[in-house]
Amino acid sequence: SGAVIQDIGDGILNLEFQSKMNTIGADVLTAINKAIDLAETNHPGLVIGNQGANFSVGANIGMIFMMAVEQEYDELNYAIKYFQDTMMRMRYSSIPTIAAPHGMALGGGCEISLHADKVVAAAETYMGLVEFGVGVIPGGGGSKEMALRASDLFHKGDVQLNVLQEHFLTCLLY
């Protein structure tokens, strides 16, 4: 399997990815769901972390590429939906979820962190939604979570426009 679930003390579960480069595939998503099932029945919380060089370099892009090339669109849509459903389940589970990223937390690894209730990141953590670099949009809900977290910082009545948006609007109005 791509992940191991273990009790790390005080009944807290830890989910440790063990796939190559801690990539996220169906086996890891199944393990996340299993860990949530276990934690919600008998444990006070879930930590997602590992001792590898990197937290996770994201989805298995090779698998996604092959599905697209072979025009297996139903399987590709199912894989994306399974990832999204798993992230939403993690976000709204009845137990606290903690992500402990370190090293690289890219793409899906970043999205897992964004859906956790708490993130305890190592000082040298390189995190981001890098999907645009390979020509795709983040599929696990990371863009939504990033926008929601940013909006939590706004105060009632604030107008939040970055410089690019402001210049773009100026060009359109004149």
In which residue ranges do the predicted regions lie?
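Short beta-strand/loop segment at the start of cytosolic alpha/beta domains
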Residues: 1-19
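A structural preference for short, pocket-lining loop segments at secondary-structure junctions
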Residues: 10-16, 29-74, 84-100, 122-126
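CoA-thioester-processing core
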Residues: 106-168
